[in-house]
């Protein structure tokens, strides 16, 4: 990770600075605690950059801890993908990977302690009844008829739960707090529920599993976390976080702080809705390049540095807001414009023949891999009598604003010669099949000797040397800025989110490596697809265009 990446400031860092200055803490210890029930998305990237970035900048520690308390929804596949995503973003966790399930024995003991203090009880209301008894924001809840069981009875019943003697859903352990609390989260929340499911870490050892709010705070305390950072939807949960730690025998009491989550326009962040996109085959998987998942962004050709820069630019605040997709794409363009090697590709080819060049003539032209970075070296690209240019780069007639090839006029071929269009050949439908040109042999990368002005420049590939390729032109998956607000978010799918074209690339791209993004000159940024591209079948994903076309469309 570059040292040039500016260290941001925000209200959380100000709190940390004050804690260190006052001596409240002598070091900083954070954690990133994802649930392994899906793939991480760009919103998680913000949390990763915040937690790991703070640990890095304060020479502290950051744990990677999987909140694996629901075996029904979790899978080792997600565990491995999350580890890859964190490392791809440029971070390493402190020590071994941790799991909430590592603490199941301690959590069970703390549950027994709460029961022993009369602060937890086994409830046999159904889930629906618990919801009814909980009340609303404007009306208090009411006590469960099982709330006043004795400590001895609750201990015995909780043991029966642990031994699997209750059916799933027939009993749970609840905290005994206040059913009239103005905060619904404090109205006797569930601490443990029964699930007869094999766990990816603990197997079948347990059939009772702790809830997030009980697990999260205790895991933080056991690991010595100093600053527990969550998104704003957990703000009310902080009261329960503190209540649990205040009522058990544990020496460490971390403090929870909340920050705004990332809401990105033209995207969905809900795991449930993302899962629906996958299950309904709207996209081809969690790593589909149109998905906001980190694996999808990586496959599309986004760089880790650009994602980190995006997270830095949007900052950390306490106010929820929607971030424009253009802000993310701007970070990608800035990074790739600076670092992506250049190459030429023709996405909609039409044949071009240079009449005054010998049929067997082949010239290797030296071209820079980057126009402003000589340290990136050069490449040799063959130039021959027959070329392909993009169909949009030729017109039989055009006005003065059209700076490309026009019949009877000149244009420059990128890093090559000036050519003049002399005539065209068409098929029976009137479609141009071949453009016949002449070239000025004295104009290789220089102006014509007679001083005539040639303003336009177009890209090209040699027809006999170019490699056939498939181009996947990815765009925003949704056609509206806030698809989540729609009654049926699937109705807002952009039908043009994927357009496939077939054309040609210069031969230097034969060994294009997935996740290495190129600027295809005048076309955009592309990378070889990790799933489908091979030496015999090149497939390139468009990472992002050279400019924001959506801004124009909105005008």
UniProtKB/Swiss-Prot annotation:
GO cellular component annotations of the record: cytosol
Family as reported in the entry's similarity comment: Belongs to the class-I aminoacyl-tRNA synthetase family.
Keyword Transport annotated: no
Location in the cell: Cytoplasm
Entry-linked SUPFAM superfamilies: Nucleotidylyl transferase, Ribosomal protein L25-like
Reactions the enzyme catalyzes: tRNA(Gln) + L-glutamine + ATP = L-glutaminyl-tRNA(Gln) + AMP + diphosphate
Residues given in the record as L-glutamine binding sites: 67, 212
The keyword Nucleotide-binding belongs to this UniProt entry's keyword annotation: yes
Residue ranges annotated as motif 'KMSKS' region: 268-272
Name of protein: Glutamine--tRNA ligase
Chief place where the protein resides: cytoplasm
UniProt gene name: glnS
Subunit and partners: Monomer.
Domain of life where this protein originates: Bacteria
Species of provenance: Edwardsiella ictaluri (strain 93-146)
EC number in record: 6.1.1.18
GO terms (BP aspect): glutaminyl-tRNA aminoacylation; glutamyl-tRNA aminoacylation
Protein residues bound to ATP: 35-37, 41-47, 231, 261-262, 269-271
GO molecular function list: ATP binding; glutamine-tRNA ligase activity
Keywords in alphabetical order: Aminoacyl-tRNA synthetase, ATP-binding, Cytoplasm, Ligase, Nucleotide-binding, Protein biosynthesis
InterPro entries noted in UniProt: aa-tRNA-synth_I_CS, Gln-tRNA-synth, Gln/Glu-tRNA_Ligase, Gln_tRNA_ligase_bac, Glu/Gln-tRNA-synth, Glu/Gln-tRNA-synth_Ib_cat-dom, Glu/Gln-tRNA-synth_Ib_codon-bd, Glu_tRNA_lig_a-bdl
Renumbered ranges of motif 'HIGH' region: 34-44
Class of enzymatic activity (EC top level): ligase
